[in-house]
Amino acid sequence: MSNQHNQEKLSSARFSEATDAFVEEFTASIQFDKRMYRQDIQGSVAHAKMLHKVGILDKQELKDIIDGLEKVQSDIEAGKMNWSIKQEDIHMNIEAKLTELIGITGKKLHTGRSRNDQVATDIRLYLRDEIDAILPEMARLQHGILLLAEKEAETIMPGFTHLQTAQPVTFGHHMMAWFEMIKRDVERLEDCRKRVNTMPLGSAALAGTTYPIQREYTAELLQFDRISENSLDGVSDRDFAIEFTAFAATFLMHLSRFSEELVLWSSAQFNFIDLPDRFCTGSSIMPQKKNPDVPELVRGKTGRVYGHLMSLLTLMKSQPLAYNKDNQEDKEPLFDTVDTVKGSLRAFADMVPAIIVNREATYAAAKQGFSTATDLADYLVNKGLPFRDAHEVVGLAVAHGIQTGQDLSEMPLETLQAFHSSITDDVFEVLTLEGSVSARDHLGGTAPKQVKAAIKRAKDRL
């Protein structure tokens, strides 16, 4: 970054001495808010068109401003822009460069506008753009989950509670659980976008402006759905950024839980899945290692988003109306949250459909831990026992199985009948893994038929 301390500071006339060099650096935000240059220029072009519409700028002045802003953007994208800490932020840097290019007309651009409503508009435009980039990637992840779920709709695996074997489920059913969670995350983000897409421009510093602005026209140019209806609120609140970060924290929480399973399942102890080599790394000392770095990093990065959410909440919690310099601290947490979501999302969307399932291992694991015990209890209920009595009978049978090393399906009929006389040879139909999953044939159940129907509904929605 070039520090042009010889450049006149655009807001310096009121002061009797120059700003301390360290204070200039300490209070500047250009180091990070320059990423919003497109949105700042987009907002300025719309503002200039509105100023022309209401008679504040003539036709030539409007042309000069738009041409100048296009040149500024071209210079930025070509790496020719000399960013100045002396000009503090993205807004003043662009205005100073514009004035350098087109002269005094550049100084008219800020008429009827403050940096307070300008930055609030920039952030909303930036976040709207990022949301619009994130949503298709979330759909890509959903498609990837559906591909894997469809491929493994009949693959049997153990379902867990407390990370202990509970009941058999299908791998496809398990994947569809993640699909449902991410579907709600998509809905949260779409809902968040509605509130992000509100235009504060025209609020000026805090009280509005005396100029005859037409906010509706500016909003139309910038494709905002709504206009903020209170100028104090428009410039001072960052609840929309908090809401996005809350979405991100929830979404990353889901990806972190998913990651935890992928890390466990890819271990030699589980051996349920294999992650393709391109999503893993090796060890510098142990030549046999294949480390699941992608899910581990996503799991780790979740914590930083939690931190950003708390940072933004804490930033806003004690601010009186309207704008305060504290709000400069909203951008780095928001920007890093956006980057973390996009990176984690891309990694998962690439990785999930490429996961290879070890069907023999998942089936063998489902046969352990008496996973069909509940099916035996349900069988006894259908024979007339109250569920609590059936629960007790099966508990005794499981205890016997632990002592003898036999699964329920491996016990002779006579052994099972010793626990209750109503048991007949039809019991073995319900004690198979296939029988167990197929019996749960209802909306939301793990039966392959229901899993395939759920996948079809999901595809239709997407």
From Swiss-Prot:
Transmembrane segments: none annotated. It is found in: Cytoplasm. GO terms for biological process: arginine biosynthetic process via ornithine; L-arginine biosynthetic process. It catalyses: 2-(N(omega)-L-arginino)succinate = fumarate + L-arginine. Keywords: Amino-acid biosynthesis, Arginine biosynthesis, Cytoplasm, Lyase. Pathway: Amino-acid biosynthesis; L-arginine biosynthesis; L-arginine from L-ornithine and carbamoyl phosphate: step 3/3. InterPro entries: Arg_succ_lyase_C, Argininosuccinate_lyase, Fumarase/histidase_N, Fumarate_lyase_CS, Fumarate_lyase_fam, Fumarate_lyase_N, L-Aspartase-like. The keyword Lyase applies. One of its GO terms (molecular function) is argininosuccinate lyase activity. Signal peptide: none annotated. The keyword Amino-acid biosynthesis applies. GO terms for cellular component: cytosol. The lineage of its organism: Bacteria, Pseudomonadati, Pseudomonadota, Gammaproteobacteria, Thiotrichales. This is Argininosuccinate lyase. Belongs to the lyase 1 family. Argininosuccinate lyase subfamily. Its main location: cytoplasm. NCBIfam families: argH. HAMAP family: Arg_succ_lyase. The gene is argH. Its EC number is 4.3.2.1. PANTHER family: ARGININOSUCCINATE LYASE.
